Design a protein with these regions (language model features):
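Short hydrophobic/aromatic-enriched beta-strand-loop microsegments
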Residues: 1-3, 325-338, 407-415
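ATP-dependent carboxylate activation and anion-phosphoryl transfer catalytic cores
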Residues: 2, 20, 24-25, 47-50, ...
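A conserved helix-loop-beta module that forms one wall/lid of the active-site cleft
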Residues: 3-64, 323-332, 390-402
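Glycine-rich phosphate/diphosphate-binding loops that line cofactor/substrate pockets in enzymes
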Residues: 43-47, 271-284, 304-305, 346-353
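Active-site rim loops that border cofactor/substrate pockets in soluble metabolic enzymes
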Residues: 282, 318-347
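Short internal beta-strands
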Residues: 285, 308-320
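Glycine/threonine-rich flexible loop motifs
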Residues: 295, 361-375
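C-terminal functional extensions of proteins
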Residues: 389-428
Length: 428
Protein backbone atom coordinates (compact mmCIF):
# COMPACT_ATOMS: atom_id res chain seq x y z
CA UNK A 1 0.00 0.00 0.00
CA UNK A 2 1.10 3.55 -0.62
CA UNK A 3 4.34 4.74 -2.16
CA UNK A 4 6.99 2.04 -2.59
CA UNK A 5 9.92 2.20 -0.19
CA UNK A 6 12.41 2.50 -3.04
CA UNK A 7 10.58 5.61 -4.25
CA UNK A 8 10.67 7.11 -0.77
CA UNK A 9 14.42 6.52 -0.67
CA UNK A 10 14.74 8.13 -4.11
CA UNK A 11 13.19 11.30 -2.69
CA UNK A 12 15.12 11.22 0.62
CA UNK A 13 18.51 10.32 -0.84
CA UNK A 14 19.93 13.61 -2.10
CA UNK A 15 22.05 12.01 -4.83
CA UNK A 16 19.21 9.94 -6.27
CA UNK A 17 16.75 12.83 -6.09
CA UNK A 18 19.24 15.17 -7.72
CA UNK A 19 19.68 12.74 -10.61
CA UNK A 20 15.91 12.62 -11.03
CA UNK A 21 15.66 16.42 -11.14
CA UNK A 22 18.42 16.54 -13.76
CA UNK A 23 16.50 14.01 -15.85
CA UNK A 24 13.37 16.17 -15.55
CA UNK A 25 15.37 19.31 -16.43
CA UNK A 26 14.39 20.95 -13.13
CA UNK A 27 16.82 23.31 -11.41
CA UNK A 28 18.20 22.80 -7.91
CA UNK A 29 20.74 24.72 -5.82
CA UNK A 30 24.31 23.50 -6.25
CA UNK A 31 25.14 20.86 -3.67
CA UNK A 32 27.54 18.09 -2.74
CA UNK A 33 27.77 15.28 -0.22
CA UNK A 34 31.04 15.60 1.68
CA UNK A 35 32.80 13.92 4.59
CA UNK A 36 35.76 16.18 5.40
CA UNK A 37 36.26 19.81 6.29
CA UNK A 38 38.73 20.21 3.43
CA UNK A 39 36.15 19.09 0.87
CA UNK A 40 33.54 21.37 2.41
CA UNK A 41 35.81 24.42 2.34
CA UNK A 42 36.76 23.74 -1.28
CA UNK A 43 33.08 23.45 -2.27
CA UNK A 44 32.17 26.65 -0.41
CA UNK A 45 34.95 28.53 -2.15
CA UNK A 46 33.65 27.24 -5.48
CA UNK A 47 29.97 28.22 -5.08
CA UNK A 48 30.46 31.12 -2.65
CA UNK A 49 29.12 31.73 0.83
CA UNK A 50 26.63 31.43 2.44
CA UNK A 51 26.04 27.69 2.31
CA UNK A 52 23.60 25.37 4.08
CA UNK A 53 24.97 22.36 5.95
CA UNK A 54 22.73 19.46 6.89
CA UNK A 55 23.00 15.76 7.70
CA UNK A 56 20.96 13.25 5.70
CA UNK A 57 17.55 12.03 6.89
CA UNK A 58 16.67 14.81 9.32
CA UNK A 59 13.36 16.12 10.62
CA UNK A 60 12.57 19.67 11.74
CA UNK A 61 15.91 20.88 10.42
CA UNK A 62 17.86 19.09 13.16
CA UNK A 63 21.56 20.05 13.07
CA UNK A 64 21.04 22.24 9.99
CA UNK A 65 23.04 25.47 9.90
CA UNK A 66 23.79 28.30 7.50
CA UNK A 67 27.50 29.10 7.32
CA UNK A 68 28.62 32.54 6.20
CA UNK A 69 32.38 32.04 6.36
CA UNK A 70 35.07 29.39 6.78
CA UNK A 71 35.13 29.49 10.58
CA UNK A 72 31.39 28.97 11.00
CA UNK A 73 31.50 26.26 8.31
CA UNK A 74 34.07 24.24 10.28
CA UNK A 75 32.04 24.59 13.50
CA UNK A 76 28.82 23.62 11.72
CA UNK A 77 30.41 20.66 9.97
CA UNK A 78 31.68 19.28 13.27
CA UNK A 79 28.16 19.46 14.70
CA UNK A 80 26.55 17.85 11.65
CA UNK A 81 29.02 14.96 11.57
CA UNK A 82 28.51 14.27 15.26
CA UNK A 83 24.76 13.99 14.67
CA UNK A 84 24.93 11.63 11.68
CA UNK A 85 28.39 10.15 11.29
CA UNK A 86 27.24 7.24 9.12
CA UNK A 87 26.13 9.48 6.26
CA UNK A 88 27.92 12.19 4.27
CA UNK A 89 26.98 15.74 5.14
CA UNK A 90 25.00 17.51 2.43
CA UNK A 91 26.25 21.02 1.70
CA UNK A 92 24.10 23.27 -0.48
CA UNK A 93 24.46 26.76 -1.89
CA UNK A 94 22.23 29.04 0.19
CA UNK A 95 20.32 31.77 -1.64
CA UNK A 96 19.88 35.09 0.14
CA UNK A 97 16.81 37.25 -0.55
CA UNK A 98 14.95 34.32 -2.12
CA UNK A 99 11.28 33.50 -1.70
CA UNK A 100 10.25 30.08 -0.40
CA UNK A 101 7.16 28.37 -1.76
CA UNK A 102 5.81 24.89 -1.14
CA UNK A 103 3.07 22.56 -2.37
CA UNK A 104 1.03 20.01 -0.46
CA UNK A 105 -0.71 17.44 -2.58
CA UNK A 106 -1.82 13.88 -3.25
CA UNK A 107 -0.93 11.62 -6.17
CA UNK A 108 -2.58 8.34 -7.19
CA UNK A 109 0.14 7.32 -9.63
CA UNK A 110 -1.66 8.91 -12.57
CA UNK A 111 -3.29 12.09 -11.30
CA UNK A 112 -1.67 14.81 -9.20
CA UNK A 113 -3.88 16.96 -6.98
CA UNK A 114 -2.13 20.08 -5.70
CA UNK A 115 -3.94 21.18 -2.56
CA UNK A 116 -2.40 24.64 -2.63
CA UNK A 117 0.71 26.58 -3.46
CA UNK A 118 1.83 28.16 -0.20
CA UNK A 119 4.15 31.18 0.00
CA UNK A 120 6.30 31.96 3.03
CA UNK A 121 6.08 35.60 4.11
CA UNK A 122 9.66 35.51 5.37
CA UNK A 123 12.48 35.06 2.87
CA UNK A 124 14.07 31.63 2.58
CA UNK A 125 16.18 30.66 5.57
CA UNK A 126 13.37 30.29 8.10
CA UNK A 127 12.27 26.71 8.77
CA UNK A 128 8.88 25.96 7.24
CA UNK A 129 7.55 25.08 10.69
CA UNK A 130 8.45 28.57 11.91
CA UNK A 131 7.46 30.48 8.77
CA UNK A 132 4.32 32.56 8.40
CA UNK A 133 2.50 31.20 5.34
CA UNK A 134 -0.07 32.55 2.90
CA UNK A 135 -2.61 30.94 0.56
CA UNK A 136 -2.75 32.04 -2.20
CA UNK A 137 0.79 33.36 -2.84
CA UNK A 138 1.04 37.14 -2.50
CA UNK A 139 4.26 38.16 -4.25
CA UNK A 140 5.25 35.49 -6.78
CA UNK A 141 4.14 35.92 -10.40
CA UNK A 142 1.62 33.82 -12.30
CA UNK A 143 4.48 32.64 -14.50
CA UNK A 144 6.33 31.30 -11.47
CA UNK A 145 3.16 29.67 -10.12
CA UNK A 146 2.61 27.89 -13.45
CA UNK A 147 6.19 26.65 -13.40
CA UNK A 148 5.79 25.36 -9.84
CA UNK A 149 2.61 23.50 -10.81
CA UNK A 150 4.41 21.95 -13.79
CA UNK A 151 7.41 20.89 -11.72
CA UNK A 152 5.19 19.44 -8.99
CA UNK A 153 3.29 17.30 -11.48
CA UNK A 154 6.49 16.04 -13.10
CA UNK A 155 8.12 15.15 -9.77
CA UNK A 156 5.06 13.39 -8.33
CA UNK A 157 4.54 11.26 -11.44
CA UNK A 158 8.25 10.47 -11.84
CA UNK A 159 8.42 9.26 -8.23
CA UNK A 160 5.22 7.21 -8.74
CA UNK A 161 3.72 8.58 -5.56
CA UNK A 162 0.65 6.87 -4.13
CA UNK A 163 -0.40 9.12 -1.27
CA UNK A 164 0.58 12.49 0.22
CA UNK A 165 3.61 14.59 -0.62
CA UNK A 166 5.15 18.01 -0.05
CA UNK A 167 7.55 19.82 -2.39
CA UNK A 168 9.54 22.87 -1.29
CA UNK A 169 10.85 25.47 -3.73
CA UNK A 170 13.11 28.51 -3.84
CA UNK A 171 12.24 31.42 -6.13
CA UNK A 172 15.08 33.79 -7.02
CA UNK A 173 14.82 36.34 -9.85
CA UNK A 174 11.84 34.40 -11.31
CA UNK A 175 13.92 31.21 -11.43
CA UNK A 176 12.46 28.21 -9.59
CA UNK A 177 14.68 25.74 -7.72
CA UNK A 178 13.61 22.58 -5.91
CA UNK A 179 14.74 22.24 -2.30
CA UNK A 180 13.30 18.82 -1.52
CA UNK A 181 10.31 16.52 -1.85
CA UNK A 182 8.87 14.70 1.18
CA UNK A 183 6.67 11.69 0.50
CA UNK A 184 4.52 12.07 3.59
CA UNK A 185 1.88 14.26 5.13
CA UNK A 186 3.53 17.56 6.05
CA UNK A 187 2.71 19.71 9.08
CA UNK A 188 1.10 22.25 6.73
CA UNK A 189 -1.34 19.75 5.21
CA UNK A 190 -4.14 20.37 7.78
CA UNK A 191 -3.78 24.12 7.12
CA UNK A 192 -3.98 23.60 3.36
CA UNK A 193 -6.94 21.26 3.76
CA UNK A 194 -9.01 23.70 5.79
CA UNK A 195 -8.10 26.58 3.50
CA UNK A 196 -9.18 24.64 0.40
CA UNK A 197 -12.13 22.85 1.95
CA UNK A 198 -10.65 19.59 0.69
CA UNK A 199 -9.43 17.03 3.22
CA UNK A 200 -6.05 16.02 1.82
CA UNK A 201 -5.53 13.47 4.60
CA UNK A 202 -8.77 11.70 3.66
CA UNK A 203 -7.84 11.87 -0.02
CA UNK A 204 -4.38 10.45 0.69
CA UNK A 205 -5.81 7.61 2.79
CA UNK A 206 -8.24 6.70 0.00
CA UNK A 207 -5.41 6.64 -2.54
CA UNK A 208 -3.19 4.53 -0.27
CA UNK A 209 -6.07 2.04 -0.01
CA UNK A 210 -6.22 1.77 -3.79
CA UNK A 211 -8.65 4.55 -4.67
CA UNK A 212 -8.37 7.28 -7.29
CA UNK A 213 -8.55 11.04 -6.96
CA UNK A 214 -12.07 12.13 -8.07
CA UNK A 215 -11.82 13.92 -11.41
CA UNK A 216 -14.21 16.65 -10.28
CA UNK A 217 -11.69 17.84 -7.67
CA UNK A 218 -8.88 18.44 -10.15
CA UNK A 219 -9.92 21.88 -11.38
CA UNK A 220 -11.77 23.34 -8.41
CA UNK A 221 -10.86 27.03 -7.92
CA UNK A 222 -9.49 28.52 -4.72
CA UNK A 223 -11.87 30.40 -2.46
CA UNK A 224 -12.16 34.16 -2.76
CA UNK A 225 -10.30 34.76 0.49
CA UNK A 226 -6.80 34.58 1.99
CA UNK A 227 -5.63 32.21 4.71
CA UNK A 228 -2.56 32.70 6.89
CA UNK A 229 -0.73 30.17 9.05
CA UNK A 230 1.28 31.68 11.91
CA UNK A 231 3.67 29.83 14.24
CA UNK A 232 3.39 29.77 18.01
CA UNK A 233 6.44 29.67 20.26
CA UNK A 234 7.15 28.77 23.88
CA UNK A 235 10.04 31.16 24.45
CA UNK A 236 8.39 32.55 27.60
CA UNK A 237 8.70 29.10 29.18
CA UNK A 238 12.24 28.53 27.92
CA UNK A 239 14.42 30.61 30.21
CA UNK A 240 17.25 32.45 28.42
CA UNK A 241 16.34 31.00 25.00
CA UNK A 242 16.98 33.44 22.15
CA UNK A 243 13.73 34.09 20.21
CA UNK A 244 15.51 34.11 16.87
CA UNK A 245 14.55 32.01 13.86
CA UNK A 246 16.61 30.07 11.34
CA UNK A 247 16.78 26.79 9.47
CA UNK A 248 16.26 24.70 12.62
CA UNK A 249 12.66 24.57 13.85
CA UNK A 250 11.77 26.38 17.09
CA UNK A 251 7.96 26.64 17.13
CA UNK A 252 5.80 24.41 19.31
CA UNK A 253 2.45 25.02 17.61
CA UNK A 254 0.64 26.98 14.96
CA UNK A 255 -2.63 28.74 14.21
CA UNK A 256 -4.43 29.53 10.98
CA UNK A 257 -6.98 32.21 10.14
CA UNK A 258 -8.96 33.28 7.08
CA UNK A 259 -9.64 36.86 6.07
CA UNK A 260 -11.12 38.92 3.28
CA UNK A 261 -7.60 39.86 2.15
CA UNK A 262 -3.96 39.34 3.13
CA UNK A 263 -3.69 42.06 5.83
CA UNK A 264 -6.99 40.98 7.38
CA UNK A 265 -5.96 37.32 7.58
CA UNK A 266 -2.49 38.19 8.88
CA UNK A 267 -3.78 40.36 11.72
CA UNK A 268 -6.26 37.67 12.76
CA UNK A 269 -3.55 35.00 12.77
CA UNK A 270 -1.14 37.12 14.81
CA UNK A 271 -3.84 37.79 17.37
CA UNK A 272 -4.65 34.08 17.50
CA UNK A 273 -0.95 33.40 18.13
CA UNK A 274 -1.07 35.76 21.16
CA UNK A 275 0.97 38.47 19.46
CA UNK A 276 -0.59 41.69 20.73
CA UNK A 277 0.23 44.05 17.88
CA UNK A 278 -0.50 47.71 18.77
CA UNK A 279 -3.22 48.88 16.37
CA UNK A 280 -4.07 52.34 17.65
CA UNK A 281 -0.56 53.72 18.06
CA UNK A 282 2.17 53.59 20.68
CA UNK A 283 5.92 53.30 20.98
CA UNK A 284 7.96 51.13 18.63
CA UNK A 285 11.60 50.25 19.32
CA UNK A 286 13.62 49.75 16.14
CA UNK A 287 17.03 48.13 16.52
CA UNK A 288 18.93 46.92 13.46
CA UNK A 289 22.59 46.25 12.75
CA UNK A 290 24.66 47.28 9.75
CA UNK A 291 24.15 50.02 7.17
CA UNK A 292 22.36 47.74 4.71
CA UNK A 293 19.71 46.70 7.23
CA UNK A 294 19.30 50.29 8.39
CA UNK A 295 18.62 51.36 4.80
CA UNK A 296 16.06 48.60 4.39
CA UNK A 297 14.20 49.56 7.55
CA UNK A 298 13.81 53.25 6.54
CA UNK A 299 10.59 52.70 4.49
CA UNK A 300 9.07 50.77 7.41
CA UNK A 301 9.92 53.55 9.85
CA UNK A 302 8.29 56.12 7.54
CA UNK A 303 5.10 54.06 7.46
CA UNK A 304 5.10 53.81 11.25
CA UNK A 305 5.52 57.59 11.60
CA UNK A 306 2.68 58.18 9.13
CA UNK A 307 0.53 55.90 11.26
CA UNK A 308 1.25 58.05 14.32
CA UNK A 309 3.67 55.77 16.16
CA UNK A 310 6.55 57.14 18.21
CA UNK A 311 9.83 55.52 17.22
CA UNK A 312 12.53 54.71 19.74
CA UNK A 313 16.02 53.76 18.53
CA UNK A 314 19.62 53.42 19.60
CA UNK A 315 22.15 56.05 18.51
CA UNK A 316 23.27 54.68 15.12
CA UNK A 317 19.76 53.68 14.06
CA UNK A 318 18.47 57.08 15.20
CA UNK A 319 21.09 58.84 13.05
CA UNK A 320 20.06 56.80 10.01
CA UNK A 321 16.40 57.66 10.62
CA UNK A 322 17.15 61.36 11.15
CA UNK A 323 19.05 61.51 7.85
CA UNK A 324 15.79 60.48 6.21
CA UNK A 325 13.72 63.06 8.10
CA UNK A 326 12.29 60.50 10.51
CA UNK A 327 12.17 61.61 14.13
CA UNK A 328 13.15 59.10 16.79
CA UNK A 329 13.69 59.08 20.54
CA UNK A 330 17.23 58.02 21.44
CA UNK A 331 17.63 55.11 23.85
CA UNK A 332 20.94 54.05 25.34
CA UNK A 333 22.00 50.48 24.62
CA UNK A 334 21.64 47.61 27.06
CA UNK A 335 25.34 47.55 27.94
CA UNK A 336 25.16 51.30 28.66
CA UNK A 337 23.09 50.60 31.77
CA UNK A 338 22.88 53.64 34.02
CA UNK A 339 22.55 56.00 31.09
CA UNK A 340 18.96 57.16 30.67
CA UNK A 341 16.68 56.57 28.92
CA UNK A 342 17.94 52.99 28.55
CA UNK A 343 16.39 50.19 26.52
CA UNK A 344 16.18 47.84 29.50
CA UNK A 345 14.46 50.50 31.61
CA UNK A 346 11.88 51.26 28.91
CA UNK A 347 11.10 47.57 28.37
CA UNK A 348 10.77 46.92 32.09
CA UNK A 349 8.47 49.90 32.59
CA UNK A 350 6.19 48.92 29.69
CA UNK A 351 7.00 52.02 27.66
CA UNK A 352 7.60 49.99 24.49
CA UNK A 353 4.60 48.47 22.69
CA UNK A 354 6.45 46.53 19.98
CA UNK A 355 10.06 45.71 19.11
CA UNK A 356 11.45 45.41 15.59
CA UNK A 357 14.90 43.86 15.95
CA UNK A 358 16.58 42.65 12.76
CA UNK A 359 19.67 40.64 13.81
CA UNK A 360 23.07 40.90 12.21
CA UNK A 361 24.19 38.00 9.97
CA UNK A 362 26.18 35.27 11.69
CA UNK A 363 29.34 36.21 9.83
CA UNK A 364 29.90 39.34 11.93
CA UNK A 365 29.14 37.91 15.36
CA UNK A 366 32.77 37.83 16.40
CA UNK A 367 33.36 41.43 15.28
CA UNK A 368 30.33 42.80 17.07
CA UNK A 369 30.04 40.59 20.13
CA UNK A 370 28.74 43.36 22.40
CA UNK A 371 26.13 44.39 19.84
CA UNK A 372 24.98 40.80 19.43
CA UNK A 373 24.69 40.42 23.20
CA UNK A 374 22.65 43.63 23.32
CA UNK A 375 20.34 42.39 20.57
CA UNK A 376 19.83 39.10 22.37
CA UNK A 377 18.94 40.92 25.61
CA UNK A 378 16.46 43.15 23.76
CA UNK A 379 14.70 40.14 22.23
CA UNK A 380 14.80 38.18 25.46
CA UNK A 381 13.41 41.03 27.58
CA UNK A 382 10.66 41.65 25.04
CA UNK A 383 9.61 38.02 25.40
CA UNK A 384 9.84 38.10 29.20
CA UNK A 385 7.61 41.19 29.37
CA UNK A 386 5.19 39.86 26.72
CA UNK A 387 6.04 42.62 24.23
CA UNK A 388 5.60 41.69 20.54
CA UNK A 389 8.99 41.27 18.89
CA UNK A 390 9.52 40.97 15.14
CA UNK A 391 12.92 39.77 13.95
CA UNK A 392 12.23 39.51 10.22
CA UNK A 393 12.12 42.36 7.71
CA UNK A 394 9.47 40.86 5.43
CA UNK A 395 7.16 40.05 8.34
CA UNK A 396 7.67 43.54 9.78
CA UNK A 397 6.54 45.10 6.50
CA UNK A 398 3.50 42.84 6.35
CA UNK A 399 2.53 43.61 9.96
CA UNK A 400 2.78 47.38 9.43
CA UNK A 401 0.58 47.14 6.33
CA UNK A 402 -1.87 45.02 8.32
CA UNK A 403 -2.04 47.69 11.06
CA UNK A 404 -2.97 50.30 8.45
CA UNK A 405 -5.56 47.98 6.91
CA UNK A 406 -7.13 47.20 10.29
CA UNK A 407 -7.57 50.89 11.04
CA UNK A 408 -9.24 51.55 7.69
CA UNK A 409 -11.75 48.69 7.61
CA UNK A 410 -13.67 46.79 10.22
CA UNK A 411 -12.52 43.24 10.86
CA UNK A 412 -15.19 40.70 10.00
CA UNK A 413 -15.25 37.43 11.88
CA UNK A 414 -16.70 34.42 10.07
CA UNK A 415 -16.70 30.73 10.86
CA UNK A 416 -14.80 28.25 8.70
CA UNK A 417 -18.13 26.89 7.49
CA UNK A 418 -19.18 30.33 6.27
CA UNK A 419 -16.04 30.58 4.15
CA UNK A 420 -16.48 27.02 2.88
CA UNK A 421 -20.04 27.82 1.82
CA UNK A 422 -18.58 30.11 -0.84
CA UNK A 423 -16.68 27.19 -2.43
CA UNK A 424 -17.92 25.19 -5.37
CA UNK A 425 -17.45 21.95 -3.44
CA UNK A 426 -16.25 20.87 0.00
CA UNK A 427 -14.65 17.41 0.18
CA UNK A 428 -14.37 16.52 3.84
Amino acid sequence: MGTHGKRIDMAENRSKFSTLLDQLNIKQPEWNALTTSEEAIEFAQKVGYPILVRPSYVLSGAAMRVSYDEKTLKDTLDLAVSVSSEYPVVITKFFTDAREVECDGVCDGENVFIGAIVEHIENAGIHSGDATMAIPPQTVSNEVISKIEDYTNKIALALKIFGPFNVQYLVKNSEVYVIECNLRSSRSMPYVSKSRGINLMRLAAEVIMGGKIPKRLMNLPLGNYVSIKAPMFSFMRLDKADPILGVEMSSTGEVACIGEDFPDALMKSLEAADMNVPIDGGNILISVGGDELKNQVIPLAKKLKNLGFTIFATEDTKKALNKNNIEAVKLYKVHEYGMEPNIMQCLQEGRIDMVINIPLPTTVKEKFKTIMEDEYKIRRMAVDYNIPVIINLQLAKAVIDAIKNTREKKVKIKSLNEYHQTLKEVYW
